[in-house]
Amino acid sequence: MSKNAKMTNPMKVITGPNTRWSYANVWEPKSINGGTPKYSVSLIIPKSDTKTVAKIEAAIEAAYCEGEAKLKGNGKSVPALSVLKTPLRDGDLERPDDPAYAGSYFVNANATSAPGIVDADRNPILTRSEVYSGVYGRASISFYAFNSSGNKGIACGLNNLQKIRDGEPLGGKASAESDFATDDDDDFLN
């Protein structure tokens, strides 16, 4: 191995640039059901992005192998990966009524510490309105095994985000720019 070869973490994935961010709680942590407040985002990955999907599947497998002792717990054997809860989910099956998830997989990633957020040129994004549910970008995520309160599986941690381009906001609210994009200045008094 050469001196310049990078050590890679088999459980870490950088998604492709066409990943869409939904439920983007990346500026302030939110608590769910009184639990630990966390930063989170749902990453919508087109099924056509087979490279990212393959990297996620390999990272889940690596997290399973690395976490076998944790997954075994007090049991006699490690449960098969196929019976465990894993974070890569099919939007067509689990969110059939949400067009944003059609033809896509999704991964919910979260962290207790704030993710770093940069633009396409790797400059920090500090303006909150620049990052919203609906933008497209890459995400740095890591997979790990968990065994807590009788629940076992593989989870996804959120590391960093890189916004690549704007997208139609998700959540039903149009942006002011799109609402007033027409040149139709009808005189409403006539």
Annotate each language-model stretch with its function.
Residues S148-E168:
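OB-fold/S1-family single-stranded nucleic acid-binding modules
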Residues A120-G137, Y144-I154:
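Exposed beta-sheet edge/beta-hairpin loop segments within beta-rich domains
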Residues N108-L126:
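Beta-strand/loop nucleic-acid-binding surfaces
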Residues M1-V13, E168-N190:
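Acidic, gly/ser/pro-rich intrinsically disordered tails
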Residues E57-A62, R122-P124, G172-D183:
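Short intrinsically disordered coil segments
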